[in-house]
Amino acid sequence: MATTIPVPLPQSPYQVQIVPGGLAAIADHLAPLGLGKKIMVVSNPEIYDYYGEVVIQALQRAGYEVFQHLIPAGETHKTLASINELYDVAFQANLERNSTLLSLGGGVIGDMTGFGAATWLRGINFVQVPTSLLAMVDASIGGKTGVNHPQGKNLIGAFYQPRLVYIDPVVLKTLPEREFRAGMAEVIKYGVIWDSELFTALEEAEDLSSIDRLPDELLTKIIQRSCQAKVDVVSQDEKEAGLRAILNYGHTVGHGVESLTGYGVINHGEAVAIGMEAAAKIAHYLGLCDQSLGDRQRQLLLKTKLPTEMPPTLAVENLLASLLHDKKVKAGKVRFILPTAIGQVTISDAVTDEVIKATLG
């Protein structure tokens, strides 16, 4: 059964549409948007092999002129060089202001396609068709786009909202287990920061480590509740002036872990899991939450077979240095999102180097 979640942003409202088994019907959902006839599908080779033809044929049947551009998978290709290649194809296709870039892939493809759409001709249409759990519940919603810089993740980017987020949960059946678990890290995050009922539902599940062991009803609930949580937050704070910062729970340390270990060695969800464990330890050390909160969170992460420990090769001193280049630094202070109860967090810039060394060293 299809579900529609409105994203009521004043300047650029759109919808998140969850349509199980609906990938081949995507053109029907684009029709009301009044897009121009040129659509460029951006994907990676693996995802394209699974779903590219389905999407392209659906668009062509509806009368769109369709182009494609494939970017190799992985964070190591999330660069300005890759964006330049995308621009070259957009130029050759003679994409116009009313043309559309359609992202068919995970978070990396979505971030890059969105940044390309935001910057080509100073902004063209952008549609998200996420194919990973992480992209469905997090990266595809809210308009954050961008690429990595050698010195840090997502340092180059823009806020640019899609015209539509179109989710078919059935495509997750081909997602590798490690990538599924990475997405579950973001789902657990929503339970900690916003939705205690979602957290409890995850605790009651028998196994969260594999999509094959997850009942379809629970998978649909996970996607719907997570998307709704993201929409609730983003619709109140589109450009991270305040509340939206809570979505960075686990990401402060997580981004440091990703960049210091080399993008792709530890994937984004695994790094966020390590970051959430770190945040809970810091919060308990500062007296902001009970030990039981960290215990419950850790049990969920372990049930999902996600890491909770810092990589043994990562020195705390190097982590401290990397944190100062994080996008969340304000007036020279690193902002941490710290849990106070299941479903509640606070934003703090009172986490000193000494606290980090005491809890993570």
Curated annotation (Swiss-Prot):
Keywords annotated in UniProt: Amino-acid biosynthesis, Aromatic amino acid biosynthesis, Cobalt, Cytoplasm, Lyase, Metal-binding, NAD, Nucleotide-binding, Zinc
Task: Return one Gene Ontology term, BP aspect.
Answer: amino acid biosynthetic process
Catalysed reactions, semicolon-separated: 7-phospho-2-dehydro-3-deoxy-D-arabino-heptonate = 3-dehydroquinate + phosphate
- Please state the pathway this protein functions in, per its UniProt record: Metabolic intermediate biosynthesis; chorismate biosynthesis; chorismate from D-erythrose 4-phosphate and phosphoenolpyruvate: step 2/7
Subcellular localization: Cytoplasm
Q: Which cofactor does it need?
A: NAD(+); Co(2+); Zn(2+)
- Write down the CDD domains for this protein, in alphabetical order: DHQS
Where Zn(2+) is bound, by residue?
A: 186, 251, 268
The entry's NAD(+)-binding residues are 107-111, 131-132, 144, 153
- E.C. number, please? 4.2.3.4
- Task performed by this protein: Catalyzes the conversion of 3-deoxy-D-arabino-heptulosonate 7-phosphate (DAHP) to dehydroquinate (DHQ).
Q: What is this protein called?
A: 3-dehydroquinate synthase
